Amino acid sequence: MDEEDAGDFNERCAQCSEVNWGLTDGGRFYCRTCHNVIERTREVVSTDVIPNARVQTISKGSRSQKKTDEGWEWYVCEGFQLVLKQQAEALEALGVCPQMKDEVLCNFWRRYLQKSQQAYCNRPAGETIKALSVCDSSTDMDSEPEQHSLLHFLSVSESDGDLQTDCSYASSAGKVSESTSVCSGSVDGSLYVRKNRKEKLRMSMPMTLSFCYMALLWLKEPMTLSDLLRFVVEGHIPYFNAYQHFPEKMKLYGLDLRIFCVESWPVYEEVYNKMVELAAFLDLPRFPDITDNCFLHPDVLCMKYLMEANLPDELHNWTCRLVKKTSIGEVDFLTLTPGNKSTRKVKYDVLAAAVIVVVLKLLFLLDDHYEWLLSDFSAEGNKNNKEGEGGPYFEFKKWYRVIKCTLDVEQKKLDEEKAKYLWKCEKPLFYSVKKKSKILRRRQMVENLQIQFGKLSGSVQPAGRPNPSSFLLSWSEESTDGSCFHGHSLKGILQEKHGLLTAINTDYWLCTDKLCNEKLCGHLAHYREEDFPKSYHFVLRLFSFLLRIQPSSIHEEVCVIEHKLFNKKLYKKPKRKRSLRK
């Protein structure tokens, strides 16, 4: 830019007190002496279209920083945007599609800001606006509105609101007084907590995971919600103390910690329900179809969970038959359609686990009696089948012992890790430069004392976080101890009938005769461990450990599948007796 354009601006620089201004290509005033870039509104008189019409532009500039060392002025939604950015980058590092952050999650977030009246919206006349630029990142948040397009519905037109090309945020409550942010480091922290206390879809840390899962589901990524939450707990995805990665000038204290500090494990049901509500709130269209070659299809997920549960590969044929029989593999059933209240939303991982449980009930009954008889029968068959043609017969009793031993060890390890988890931030929080060195010295002293006491007590130092894996349990067919059951045969519990292999077991017990009203009870079925056989509870416990959810969630899905499978028998209308005419 020409020096003459900046010549009319004679204010002294706040940093060096010099009057030596220039203009960048973006129209921002900067000090040539100390290179400080400031916010500046300049009026340009244009006579090309309308005579004497004035056009105002607000340059991005540097954030206003208080004379004290309190840091930048920032809004709560900026903090959540940074968290989402960190989570998206972590997911990309785990192998998720690179388009997730820029082309999907970014647009979901923009849509949410517009729908919640936090940005990209018309502002009331006379409202004082403090434009705050978004932190520079590789998310292309500062790109022109024409460049972000997930679908046509996500492109925000000019009629939809005043779209700020610099993605500046402004509080929807208007001018935020200095007294508003006394109890928080952010500008609108106290206002956010007070205003959003009764709002159903207010932004929260669990909702960041709902955003991530919604983006994963849109892209049909091979990652279930249970996988996502497990990666969060293992530390591969920022969630606990995510605010420690905020820029140093974004000070957090008071109510900010109440918003961004997490001291509880993410709950599957909460994250999933918020995702469904969020998709409807954003008016998203029908998600991409879940077809039979998609990872989230029950046929594919059943194969994964059969391997992880150390069950025979032949069970996959039975799970596929059950999926086809109950029509739960249909595209319309599996695909999420936001806002459609007539269709039940699918939890893909829970559905696949429930399918396996129903198949085990069909074959082994799981009544604490019949499965052991079948196991003894298979053991006799293995003695007679010494050559091992077609693989050894599957013995439920042997499988139970192997899995129970492994499950008890892994469950104990998980419980200990959760009990020892320190809900503290690795990066100490300080709100004054004067106190920074004092706090750092105190933290270093505490850590040194912990190391010394640990050595004296002989406690084992916690191992680093495990490498990310889609499998919690792995079983090798090359093991010589016979602990892998993948190649075992089901012939010991099957019989040939009319040229087809059918189960020897012809009985079945239902978990419930009638499903509850979900709107009234909150659940379709209820589960109490003492009301069901121990074998059934053991299988539920196994899959609840693999998915990190409550056994009641899988039990509820089992009840739904059973009612689909035995629908005709359960709701068969009695025939009316014909009265004989005289």
Swiss-Prot record:
Region (C-terminal cyclin fold) location: 256-366
Domain comment, as recorded: Although it shares weak sequence similarity with GTF2B/TFIIB, displays a similar subdomain organization as GTF2B/TFIIB, with a N-terminal zinc finger, a connecting region (composed of B-reader and B-linker regions), followed by 2 cyclin folds. The RRN7-type zinc finger plays an essential postrecruitment role in Pol I transcription at a step preceding synthesis of the first 40 nucleotides.
Keywords: DNA-binding, Metal-binding, Nucleus, Transcription, Transcription regulation, Zinc, Zinc-finger
Region (N-terminal cyclin fold): 74-255
Protein name: TATA box-binding protein-associated factor RNA polymerase I subunit B
UniProt-listed GO biological process terms: nucleolar large rRNA transcription by RNA polymerase I; RNA polymerase I preinitiation complex assembly
Function field: Component of RNA polymerase I core factor complex that acts as a GTF2B/TFIIB-like factor and plays a key role in multiple steps during transcription initiation such as pre-initiation complex (PIC) assembly and postpolymerase recruitment events in polymerase I (Pol I) transcription. Binds rDNA promoters and plays a role in Pol I recruitment.
Protein's UniProt keywords contain Zinc: yes
GO molecular function: RNA polymerase I core promoter sequence-specific DNA binding; zinc ion binding
Main location: nucleus
